Amino acid sequence: SPLARIQAENAISRIDYPSEIITMLEVADEDLTRPVHEMGGKGMFCTKLEKALLKNQIDCAIHSAKDCATIETEGTELLGVVYRGDPRDCVIGKHSLNQLPAGSRIGTSAPRRIEALKLIRPDCHVVEVRGNVNTRLNKINSGEVDALILGQSVIDRMGLDVPHHTISEEVILPAAGAGKVVVQV
C-alpha cells in the first residue's frame, strides 16, 4: 500500500543503510470482505513478511507496531521502534465526532473503535470498511460513509490534505503501538 511504502522509505532513511524495498500483499489485505479478527487478528498484517524473514528472503521487515501480534513469531525478533507519530485517532470528514449529525455513517474496521463509537455515538451507524487509505477515503467521496476513523499518524505520514478532527485519548484510547513503526528481524 502507499502507506506501507512511505513507512518503509522513512524507516530506511533513518537506518541509513543501503536497502531495497520488497513489497508483499499481506493476508489481511488479500481478503477485504472479512473482518481481520475473523482471520486471526492483529498478526495478519505481518504473516507473509515474517515467513519471508524465516526463509531468509528478506533481511528485515518494517511494520506498524499496532499490527504486530502480541507474541513474537518464533525465530523473529522486534528490534525496536524506528520512529513514532501521533498515536491518536481522528475523524476524517467535515464534522468532529461530537458534531456529526445523528444517523451519520462512520467507517472503521477496528473492534476497539467500533465498541468506542457504540458508547460515544450510539445515534450513529458504524460501517465496517477495509482497504488501503485511498480506498477508505473514496468511501467518503462516494457517499458510502459520512466520516472515517483513521490514525492521526496515517494522515501525517501520507501528507493528506483532508478535513479531519483529532480525537482526544480520553474519548477513544489509541491502540497499543499506534503511531509507532518497528523493525523486525
Q: What is each stretch, according to the model?
A:
Residues 2-185:
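Domain-level signature for soluble enzymes in the chorismate/prephenate branch of the shikimate pathway
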